[in-house]
Amino acid sequence: MKINVLTLFPDMFTPLQVSMLGRGLEDGKWDLNLVNFRDFTTDVHHHVDDTPYGGGAGMVLQIMPIKKALDSLPSTGKVIITAPQGKTFNEQMAQDWAKEDELTFICGHYEGFDQRVYDLADETVSIGDYVLTGGELPTMSMIDATVRLLPGILGNAASPVEESFSHGLLEYPQYTRPADFEGQKVPEVLTSGNHQKIAEWRHKEALKATYLHRPDMLEDRQLTNEEKKMLEEIKSELD
């Protein structure tokens, strides 16, 4: 996968070049192309923004340098703008994007984009109902969530399949050594060696975590008969 990022602050993307994603870059499993659209200005001072027509506070990013930066790319794939008014990013979107050959992100700053910039994008996406100083951090979050799903990025191929949101539930609790830490013991079922019981425990605990912390995720979920029974047990245990 190739990912292009149009940004005024390419140095902000250094974190994507370390850890598992960094190793993936080195191994050629994905490619990151950072494009500073200030380089596509034509005036002496390299302005990328101007005052808004009709008046108002702040500065608005101009379409010209962004359009020229896009046109400079041999290809773009799906073009994505990060903005507060966009649809909220989620795991399903990450899974869909991970199937693409190429993605291009456009990062905003200041008071946002000239409205005509949005016409250049296929999707406008947000990471939540709050405002940041620019689109770089949301873009990095979305790149991380997407790239980690690519083959060979994570050490354990099963990891992205088993974790939170992959099956529509939050992740079950996990434990490692020691089995007893200051009286806090690992649930016996996890050390029993009974894989069926362990799977049942994990399923129920994932359902419990979702019920307690993200009940909204259960509203649209078609619960199996087994899950309905588990949920009744969970509610009874919590009463």
From Swiss-Prot:
Pfam families: tRNA_m1G_MT. One of its GO terms (biological process) is tRNA N1-guanine methylation. One of its GO terms (molecular function) is tRNA (guanine(37)-N1)-methyltransferase activity. It comes from the Bacteria. Its EC number is 2.1.1.228. CDD domains: TrmD-like. InterPro entries: Alpha/beta_knot_MTases, tRNA_m1G_MeTrfase_C_sf, tRNA_m1G_MeTrfase_TrmD, tRNA_m1G_MTases_N, tRNA_MeTrfase_TRMD/TRM10. The keyword Cell wall biogenesis/degradation does not apply. Specifically methylates guanosine-37 in various tRNAs. Homodimer. Belongs to the RNA methyltransferase TrmD family. This is tRNA (guanine-N(1)-)-methyltransferase. It comes from Lactobacillus helveticus (strain DPC 4571). The lineage of its organism: Bacteria, Bacillati, Bacillota, Bacilli, Lactobacillales.
